[in-house]
Amino acid sequence: MPHNSIRSGHGGLNQLGGAFVNGRPLPEVVRQRIVDLAHQGVRPCDISRQLRVSHGCVSKILGRYYETGSIRPGVIGGSKPKVATPKVVEKIGDYKRQNPTMFAWEIRDRLLAEGVCDNDTVPSVSSINRIIRTKVQQPFNLPMDSCVATKSLSPGHTLIPSSAVTPPESPQSDSLGSTYSINGLLGIAQPGSDSKRKMDDSDQDSCRLSIDSQSSSSGPRKHLRTDAFSQHHLEPLECPFERQHYPEAYASPSHTKGEQGLYPLPLLNSAALDDGKATLTPSNTPLGRNLSTHQTYPVVADPHSPFAIKQETPEVSSSSSTPSSLSSSAFLDLQQVGGAGVPAGASVPPFNAFPHAASVYGQFTGQALLSGREMVGPTLPGYPPHIPTSGQGSYASSAIAGMVAGSEYSGNAYGHTPYSSYGEAWRFPNSSLLSSPYYYSSTSRPSAPPTTATAFDHL
């Protein structure tokens, strides 16, 4: 066989006994014989034994033949022959312009069908795609676009150069502000250089937009500054924060006006703040023990510990004639009375959920306060309007102001009728309610309900 003759060069015998020359392809005759045996149906392993060619060489030759149809060897250690000739590139461009959706493998088949290329010179699918991408479909040329872009840009808008080059400033940007500033975008003229605020070097590095960090000292450059506000703009922004919208209700050592921490909030929020201060006297008692009279809250107290009411009367006397309308400047202080009140062996009635029925009100004299309803006023729901009896009379402000000491309070028990024994006429004085017996039936009460006048007499 021709390939058995060892030519000059490095050669030898393979594992099958066949001769080969190192770095040289198989002869053309052996390649054709391999392809012919494969067409006859001989397996690659049998072809390798018959021709004494390595199995890898047979597989490589057959694989290339099935893929490209060529049996020529590839070039080792050099460049392949150029298949993308100008004629082939022009044809590929014509095919793509005629049918833009044409695939690369269809272009390859058409090149072979029209005889533009043969099996050895036809470009591969990847080569055709590369030719279409780089040479056929070129939307723009970089040099031309750079020239057009440079011409279309205004003098104030230039392309960003490399980091080593600083873009020059134009005269228009000096008069209308920096290109990247709000004043420059809105066309607002900036004030003179004497009113500009200056920053130190550390703030300039963090707050400016600059391409070149090593700027030259040829002239001042404009940067985007986050704090570039004039005093004219800062004053209206800071005014709302200087006003105190929420006055402090608790006194603290840092108060510049210490008297404001001891007055009730409604007086501080009123328009006539100065007039209210003139009628009030600051109290040294902690605020937790001071309550203004119009802020009425039910007091739940232990029935075993009597309390005394001490009223701090201001310099200006109240003009009210009823206990329910105390002066807003008065403060009530509840203090526990020790030793005076209920005796040790006396029986104390059970605790009632309603404040006016608790025994704590039994420690008050009848002339001072009648019941809890006198403190909270007649406007609360569930309380009838107060009709004083003949023994009670009317109460002047002096009677309330001159409270007796805690040791002189009467220790008599609370002798009024409990709330649960009042009838429907007491709880429903208004006839406009929707059918009061519908909610509270009178069948469960054997005694007849008292009249309105009788119910009020119990008070």
Curated annotation (Swiss-Prot):
Q: Which residues bind DNA?
A: 9-135
| Polar residues composition bias: residue spans | 159-182
User: Where found?
Assistant: Nucleus
Which Gene Ontology CC terms are recorded?
nucleoplasm; nucleus
Instruction: Tell me one GO biological process term.
Output: positive regulation of thyroid hormone generation
Instruction: Name the UniProt key words of this record, in alphabetical order.
Output: Developmental protein, Differentiation, DNA-binding, Nucleus, Paired box, Phosphoprotein, Transcription, Transcription regulation
Region spans: PAI subdomain = 12-68
Start and end residues of each stretch annotated as Disordered: 159-223
Give one GO molecular function term. Answer: DNA-binding transcription factor activity
Q: Where is this region: RED subdomain?
A: 87-135
| Keyword Coiled coil part of the UniProt annotation | no
Main localization (coarse) = nucleus
Function according to Swiss-Prot or TrEMBL: Thought to encode a transcription factor. It may have a role in kidney cell differentiation. May play a regulatory role in mammalian development.
PANTHER family assigned: PAIRED BOX PROTEIN PAX-6-RELATED-RELATED, PAIRED BOX PROTEIN PAX-8
Quaternary form? Answer: Interacts with WWTR1.
**What is this protein's record name?**
Paired box protein Pax-8
Q: Which organism is it from?
A: Canis lupus familiaris (Dog)
Q: What is the lineage of its organism?
A: Eukaryota, Metazoa, Chordata, Craniata, Vertebrata
